[in-house]
């Protein structure tokens, strides 16, 4: 039981960058996908019927591909969007990756516009 408590403390103590690396490891090595609510779920077998290709996507992930030359302004925008602390926002900007996940289309486009105005290169997935 002490090992589980230690593991829980270690997970809670992860920085945003470390949590992102853990998510990647769990996905790549073990096939565990993160659920929308932040919980972890196992990847199940493929469904028999595929979703229609014409369905419009309503939720997007806002991804930072390049911080550009004006990194300070990008860090400020990332902090404003995510509510992260200065160090966490700086680490995220330097490493790149998802700024926000499962965001409504209008909000995702607004975030993209703000980050691009700050000098970053952003993609919506």
UniProtKB/Swiss-Prot annotation:
Gene from which the chain derives: rplL
GO cellular component, one term: cytosolic large ribosomal subunit
One Gene Ontology molecular-function label: mRNA binding
Gene Ontology biological process terms, A to Z: translation
InterPro entries: Ribosomal_bL12, Ribosomal_bL12_C, Ribosomal_bL12_C/ClpS-like, Ribosomal_bL12_oligo, Ribosomal_bL12_oligo_N_sf
Function in brief: Forms part of the ribosomal stalk which helps the ribosome interact with GTP-bound translation factors. Is thus essential for accurate translation.
Family the entry assigns: Belongs to the bacterial ribosomal protein bL12 family.
Organism: Cereibacter sphaeroides
Protein name: Large ribosomal subunit protein bL12
Pfam families reported for this sequence: Ribosomal_L12, Ribosomal_L12_N
Subunit-level organization: Homodimer. Part of the ribosomal stalk of the 50S ribosomal subunit. Forms a multimeric L10(L12)X complex, where L10 forms an elongated spine to which 2 to 4 L12 dimers bind in a sequential fashion. Binds GTP-bound translation factors.
Domain of life: Bacteria
Keyword vocabulary terms for this entry: Ribonucleoprotein, Ribosomal protein
């Amino acid at each position: 039981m002490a090992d589980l408590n230690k593991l829980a403390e270690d997970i809670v103590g992860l920085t945003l960058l470390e949590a992102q690396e853990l998510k990647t490891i769990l996905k790549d090595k073990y096939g565990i996908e993160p659920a929308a609510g932040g919980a972890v779920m196992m990847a199940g077998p493929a469904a028999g019927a595929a979703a229609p290709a014409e369905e419009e996507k309503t939720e997007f992930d806002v991804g930072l591909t390049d911080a550009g030359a004006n990194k300070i302004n990008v860090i400020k925008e990332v902090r404003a969007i995510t509510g992260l602390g200065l160090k966490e926002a700086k680490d995220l900007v330097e490493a790149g990756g998802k700024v926000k996940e499962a965001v409504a289309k209008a909000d995702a486009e607004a975030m993209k516009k703000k980050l691009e105005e700050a000098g970053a290169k952003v993609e919506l997935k």
